Amino acid sequence: MKIDILTLFPEMFAPLEHSIVGKAKEKGLLDIHYHNFRDYAEKARHVDDEPYGGGQGMLLRAQPIFDTIEQIEAKKPRIILLDPAGKPFTQAYAEELALEEELIFICGHYEGYDERIKTLVTDEISLGDFVLTGGELAAMTMVDATVRLIPQVLGKESSHQDDSFSSGLLEYPQYTRPYDYRGMTVPDVLMSGHHERIRLWRLEESLRKTYLRRPDLLERYDFSEEERKLLDKIKEALGQGED
C-alpha cells in the first residue's frame, strides 16, 4: 500500500515509524510519504486566507492543496479529507481502506477549507464528534487502524479478527499468568480446556460488555439465534428483561 499525507507538520508523524506501521514499512508492505503543502503555496508561502463574506478564522486555500496532489504520482488514489463534518471513522471503514492500493490524506488547519478543495476528494471523514487543532492526529489514528489490517502486517492473520468492533461486538475479557493475582483469579471456564464452553463464555461476555457500554452497536447488529438467546439471558440477569 502507498500512503501520501498532506500536512503542515510532517514532523508530527514520527510515531508512525515505530510499532505496527513501522514494521509494515520494514516488510515492504507499506510506502508512506509526507508532503508539506506550504512548499507548494504561492503568495509568500501563505496557505490560508480570509473567507469571502466575512466570518471568524482563516480558511485553507485551494491552490496549495491542488498543486500538491497534482505532483503526487498515483493512479487512482482514495483521497480522504479529514473534516469534523465528515462521516464517522469506523472499523468497517478501516477494513475498506485496507483493500486499497493508494491512499491520500489531507490534514487541515485553521477554521476550515475552501469548499473547492472538496472537488478533489473521494471521502470526507471525521474521527469523532469533537474538534482537533489539526488533522494530523486523526490521520495517524486512521493510518494505524488501516495498516494493521493489511495481510501479513500482523503476526497472525487472525489477530485482528477478534479485536473489538471487528465482529460488531466489543471484545471479551482476557487473562494471562498468573492464575491468582492479589486474590483476583482467572474464570474457571478459561482453565477448563473445554473449547465449546470457552467459546460460549467469550460470546456471552462480548454481548454483555457491548450491551452495557455500547448499546448503540447492538441496534445495527445482525444477531444469530444463539446470540439473541444469550442477550435475553443477560438482560434477565440484570433485571432488564422484556415484560
From Swiss-Prot:
Transmembrane segments: none
Entry keyword Cytoplasm: yes
Residues reported to bind S-adenosyl-L-methionine: G108, L127, G128, D129, F130, V131, L132
GO BP of this protein: tRNA N1-guanine methylation
Keywords of this entry: Cytoplasm, Methyltransferase, S-adenosyl-L-methionine, Transferase, tRNA processing
Any one Gene Ontology cellular component term annotated for this protein: cytosol
GO molecular function: tRNA (guanine(37)-N1)-methyltransferase activity
SUPFAM superfamilies: alpha/beta knot
Protein location: Cytoplasm
Enzyme class: transferase
Catalytic activity annotation: guanosine(37) in tRNA + S-adenosyl-L-methionine = N(1)-methylguanosine(37) in tRNA + S-adenosyl-L-homocysteine + H(+)
Job description of the protein: Specifically methylates guanosine-37 in various tRNAs.
Official protein name in the record: tRNA (guanine-N(1)-)-methyltransferase
Name of the encoding gene: trmD
